[in-house]
């Protein structure tokens, strides 16, 4: 089964840098993003399908995964690598039944018990958050769960996890230290240079970056 890896970038239909989404996605996977999640709550089905097909032509040759937020029908029709679902979307057992064996299904939860149920129902990875306060969903700022909850969800589920919500290059090491990867939207899509932002996250993932200040690494 494919794995979303260490860094998933969620898209915005209009990146702040002003360049076309396809160009920004190409820059991100070229800089090392391991997965792209196409997230567009406003596009009609035809537009979303066409965008998915165009992005897949970029991600596949680069060895990155492409998952579609919410829309299993679009993901399957386009031949995407997977779909990401929430608690109000299609139930996991139904999504699993409709999908081919190697199709990746992600699920959002911050609750260890729900994470266990999601794993049993067919989820392949979990998005866990909001870890910190987030600009994309300001109402969640007071409900930040922190890295320890990410660790707890990962342990309970036994699945690959991606911390999400308010993650920046300055705090990403705290999430990577839990054994999870990260998923980011604003930190990349709002950046003037998205590829540079992706590279900063990779630097945060290095063992040196995850070593607490004042503690020397063992050679």
Where are these regions (language model features)?
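Glycine-rich ATP-lid loops
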Residues: 142
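Conserved N-terminal beta1-alpha1 strand-loop-helix module at the mouth
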Residues: 1-92, 97-125, 145-148, 152, ...
